[in-house]
Structure formats: C-alpha cells, structure tokens
Swiss-Prot record:
Its main location: cytoplasm. The gene is acpP. Pathway: Lipid metabolism; fatty acid biosynthesis. This is Acyl carrier protein. Gene3D superfamilies: ACP-like.
C-alpha cells in the first residue's frame, strides 16, 4: 500500500470511526463505511488539508471509494 493510501485510510478511520480492517480500496464511504453526505464533505476537506491538494466539487462528487480518493490525490501530487 502506498504512503498516500496509508494516510487516506488513517483519515477515514479517524473521521468515520470505523475499524481499519473495513477500510479497503473498494470500500464505499457511504454504502460500506456508513458515511453521510456531510461526512464525505468533511473527508474531502481532510484530504485537501493532509495532502495540500485542491479537490474541486465536480471531482469530489466522483470520489466515492477509498481507491477513488487515493488515485485522485496521487494524480494531483504528481502534476
């Protein structure tokens, strides 16, 4: 698992209060981890702060799984 993936996982565990074992790449924030729409906004803000990236609203709407978040952040950091 990449450094970005580890950090995303840690943020999700802290913000949603879920067990680390449930935070898999395919885990949906809403369907699998019990997040609501406010939780997803807070997660996006936490990702932005933790990684120093900007995630516009249109991109944030497409981030629904742990893998989506990791891929988006890695792409932004590489740019």
């Amino acid at each position: 698992m990449s450094e970005v993936a580890d950090k995303v996982k840690k943020i999700v565990v802290e913000h949603l209060g879920v067990e680390e074992s449930k935070v898999t790449p395919e885990a949906s924030f809403i369907d699998d981890l019990g997040a609501d729409s406010l939780d997803t906004v807070e997660l996006v803000m936490a990702f932005e702060e933790a990684f120093g990236v900007e995630i516009p609203e249109d991109a944030a709407e497409k981030i629904s799984t742990v893998k989506d978040a990791v891929e988006y952040i890695e792409k932004q950091k590489a740019a």
